[in-house]
């Protein structure tokens, strides 16, 4: 039977009790801890959150892997060095913001600091955005929801293209990088 990985996400926690919550999630059996970092452009409702200070603060409370999913338009060597030194095990980037040479440098920096690297295909980001990078990443995350216009509001519903996207991404991973995890 396939083991389903479970993460404890920290985006909406009480930061005054974050250490206790991480320890509780660890004891409950999560597979890894999911931290976030955001800037002033993406995720406007969670501006300037996360980063190496959070990872450094929670590292003593878990031996599980900690991943940092960034919602930014920039990621430099210093940021990667800081989160790695704080105890981060994987950096996850939005594929639509990091392409070409900048992504190649980021992948190399992650490897230099002993971290894994993942890419997220956000809402309506085409699979072709990771066509070259798939060879060098450890995880591909797919966001399979999109705007649902059934009631005229911006609700997040299941995208009609989701099943096809999942199938095509699985085929890409199987053909190009079978060690890459898909979520």
Mark where each language-model region is.
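Active-site mouth loops of central-metabolism enzymes
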Residues: 3-17, 47, 65-74, 118-128
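Alpha-helix N-cap and loop-to-helix initiation/capping positions
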Residues: 13, 17, 45-53, 153-165
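Conserved, mostly hydrophobic/aromatic
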Residues: 18, 25, 36, 83
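A short, Lys/Arg-enriched amphipathic alpha-helix followed by its capping loop at the start of a domain
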Residues: 24-30
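Generic enzyme active-site microenvironment
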Residues: 34, 183
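Conserved anion-binding
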Residues: 41, 61, 78, 86-181
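A short alpha/beta connector and helix-capping loop motif
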Residues: 41-76
